[in-house]
A protein has these predicted regions:
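A short, Lys/Arg-rich alpha-helix, primarily the initiator
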Residues: 1-12
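Short alpha-helical DNA-recognition segment
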Residues: 15-33
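Residues within the helices of the helix-turn-helix
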Residues: 7, 18, 48
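DNA major-groove recognition helix of helix-turn-helix
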Residues: 35, 42, 46
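DNA major-groove recognition helix of helix-turn-helix/homeodomain DNA-binding modules
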Residues: 45-60
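The alpha-helix within a helix-turn-helix
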Residues: 10, 21, 51
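Residue-level detection of the helix-turn-helix DNA-binding "recognition helix"
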Residues: 11, 25, 36-38
Length: 65
């Protein structure tokens, strides 16, 4: 599930949640929900923003491919 991938990649890159929020322009609250799995089905725009900031493809993060 992508919740673990977001946190895993973010921490591997030494990014805080606050930093990822700032560079992706996705709120900390929203990112927290994604990482915890309490928010599902993010929009393609959100997935693209997060993926770009983590330097991964959307499919690598959200579809585990």
């Amino acid at each position: 599930m992508y919740k673990n991938r977001i946190r895993e990649i973010r921490t591997e890159k030494g990014m805080t949640l606050e930093y990822l929020s700032r560079i992706s322009q996705v709120s900390i609250g929203y990112l927290c929900h994604l990482e915890r799995g309490t928010r599902r089905n993010p929009s393609m725009k959100i997935m693209e923003k997060i993926s770009e900031c983590l330097d991964k493809s959307v499919s690598e993060i959200f579809f585990n491919k």
